Regions:
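Alpha-helical transition-metal enzyme core signature, strongest for iron centers
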Residues: 3, 75-82, 228
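Secretory-pathway/luminal and periplasmic proteins that interact with or process carbohydrate-rich
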Residues: 5-12, 81-90, 105-106, 152-157, ...
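Carbohydrate-binding/catalytic loop surfaces
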Residues: 15-38, 93-113, 161-173, 228-229
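Acidic/histidine-rich catalytic neighborhood
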Residues: 77-131
């Protein structure tokens, strides 16, 4: 895939973004293409988001050769990027510093968008290590950092999944982005099958966004309502 090609290209533009921050691995901005182009505003957690697609390809195909040769090398160096970037907060949890909820609100440490995506990256990379029977120094470090990683799931004052750590979410804010619900969709940390509290909090947050939006945002909301087992609202 072009993601593996560009992420692993020595001295490529995606690696250069990471090197500017003194990090291993790679990172991208908001706009990217198959030729390695990346521009506009920084979107660091997008590298973790890309990796979810690599893992999902394996999960649906069970192609172990693909996992070993294509997905694993990218997932590994992406984790190393976050090893270098994460910081410890006052509670001893690892958080992504100076991140944002795309097109919405302030820049803060530990924003839900970043935390949920990095959590998915670490969790799925550990799953990949299990499939491939990899147990080395990298996996040991990954396990240690994953155990201290903030998962980005915090319930706010009006029962919602919080979008930021410090900034207070505004009820009835109809922002089209649902970046604080990455753990609901496309990731799967939030589910009625896993923890009803978080599923209910995601429902409160999603309902607060309203149903009106641009086309892509409506499609996203359909997927989120489906994940919450509400076929009528999705329809």
């Amino acid at each position: 895939t072009y993601v593996s090609t560009e992420a692993l290209k020595d001295g490529g533009s995606w690696q250069q973004v990471a090197r500017k921050e003194n990090c291993r691995g790679w990172a991208v901005h908001t706009q990217n293409n198959i030729f390695g182009y990346t521009d506009w505003l920084i979107n660091r957690p997008a590298n973790a988001w890309y990796c979810t697609h690599l893992w999902q390809h394996y999960a649906y195909t069970l192609d172990k050769e693909y996992l070993r040769d294509t997905a694993w090398p990218v997932m590994k160096v992406t984790c190393q990027y976050w090893f270098d970037r994460l910081k410890e907060n006052t509670e001893g949890r690892l958080v992504a510093p100076n991140e944002w909820s795309p097109e919405h609100g302030p820049w803060e440490d530990g924003v839900a968008y970043a935390q949920q995506l990095v959590y998915a990256l670490f969790e799925e990379t550990l799953a990949a290590a299990g499939v491939l029977a990899v147990d080395d120094a990298f996996v040991s470090e990954l396990k240690e950092k994953f155990s201290r990683l903030d998962n980005g799931l915090h319930i706010g004052s009006w029962g919602q999944i919080k979008e930021w750590t410090i900034q207070e979410d505004k009820q009835g804010d109809h922002q089209r982005h649902l970046s604080h619900l990455m753990a609901l969709y496309p990731c799967d940390q939030i589910s009625y099958l896993k923890d009803k509290r978080y599923a209910e909090a995601a429902k409160v947050a999603l309902d607060s966004r309203g149903d009106g939006a641009t086309g892509w945002s409506r499609a996203w909301k359909v997927a989120c309502w489906a994940r919450l087992w509400d076929g009528e609202r999705a329809y």
